[in-house]
Amino acid sequence: MNQNRSLFAKLADGSLVLQIILGIIAGVALASFSPSSAESVAFLGDLFVGALKAIAPILVFILVAASIANQKKNTKTNMRPIIVLYLFGTFAAAITAVTMSFLFPTSLVLVSGAQGATPPEGIGEVLNTLLFKVVDNPVNALMTGNYIGILAWGVGLGIALHHASENTKTVFADVSHGVSQMVRFVIRLAPIGIFGLVANTFAATGFEAIAGYAQLLAVLLGSMLIIALIINPLIVWFKIRRNPYPLVFTCLRESGVTAFFTRSSAANIPVNMALCEKLDLHEDTFSVSIPLGATINMAGAAITITVLTLAAVHTEGIQVDILTAILLSVVAAVSACGASGVAGGSLLLIPLACSLFGISNDVAMQVVAVGFIIGVIQDSAETALNSSTDVLFTAAACEAAERQAEI
């Protein structure tokens, strides 16, 4: 019995990143030697992602309400600089994707269109959807994972309870800590969940289906790597005025790896919040900025929209001037910020961007279908970039504010 306890204690206290790496290796090995067995453990990944998605909405709601209710007077949350970083980072990603697409023009072998997919008719529809998400029924927002609505109601309840008795505030703070403990338990299950996700992905898909789109993937992933390893560190250095790479690699390692395999910014919210606590960031700040980032900080989505749209443009033989390319960057950045308001995310915003160049909806939907084919890598990398950047920019803004306060 004591031996079993010591084994569990070692697992609980061991390096989570190392355990995740072992889970990845085990998943690849199982898929290589026994694909049928690999598919049978897919439920482990589904359970892990399901648990994260289940706990994330209530975590966000309780944390936001508790942090605002317990916020002391004259406490700065640094939200304005974080939002500026989110928006600037998304626009920089779109510009980078345009540059890469011009340097390495890609043509597509188009397939049949994505079935059952309904793209938004324009940017107005995307923004309209986001606006109505704010006034969603709070119970429905929690049930459906509508983080815009959850944030709005959490902020509203927090403000309403700001003048409540200390006992009431203490109850909310205690519930917040309790939910956080549940999140830590779920996150410790990440190695098992990622083992199931990796095994199933390799067994069901492999790399045969995406081998024909190697150049497109190279442009997509190259753009994302440039943002993650060059542009984002430059932005962070500008804010904190020191070597940004230790922080960058911490965020990529502890947030990006999990996000890559869960392929869900919402599911990665608890992971990001735990990382923010580990980095000793201000809870009043990250309890709002992390779920907000999961909604509007979409550098990866901006890259996907831009690269696939320009691939369609090159396929159709359309000439693009600089002004149109800049306009595409703006549209891609704004659309990406609304990607959470569209079923299907960034891929279904491609027809909207394609309409700038007069590309028919039929062709645009074929490009969307290509996106679904390469989605196993594209969506994973996009989510990893989006989610890890949420923590990175939050940490940069908090550190910059602390440095200014000391001056």
Curated annotation (Swiss-Prot):
GO terms for molecular function: neutral L-amino acid:sodium symporter activity. It catalyses: L-serine(in) + Na(+)(in) = L-serine(out) + Na(+)(out); L-threonine(in) + Na(+)(in) = L-threonine(out) + Na(+)(out). It comes from the Bacteria. Keywords: Amino-acid transport, Cell inner membrane, Cell membrane, Membrane, Symport, Transmembrane, Transmembrane helix, Transport. One of its GO terms (biological process) is threonine transport. It is a multi-pass membrane protein. The chain crosses the membrane at residues 14-34, 48-68, 82-102, 141-161, 192-212, 216-236, 290-310, 322-342, 357-377. It is found in: Cell inner membrane. One of its GO terms (cellular component) is plasma membrane. PANTHER family: PROTON/GLUTAMATE-ASPARTATE SYMPORTER, SERINE_THREONINE TRANSPORTER SSTT. Belongs to the dicarboxylate/amino acid:cation symporter (DAACS) (TC 2.A.23) family. Involved in the import of serine and threonine into the cell, with the concomitant import of sodium (symport system). This is Serine/threonine transporter SstT. The lineage of its organism: Bacteria, Pseudomonadati, Pseudomonadota, Gammaproteobacteria, Alteromonadales. The gene is sstT.
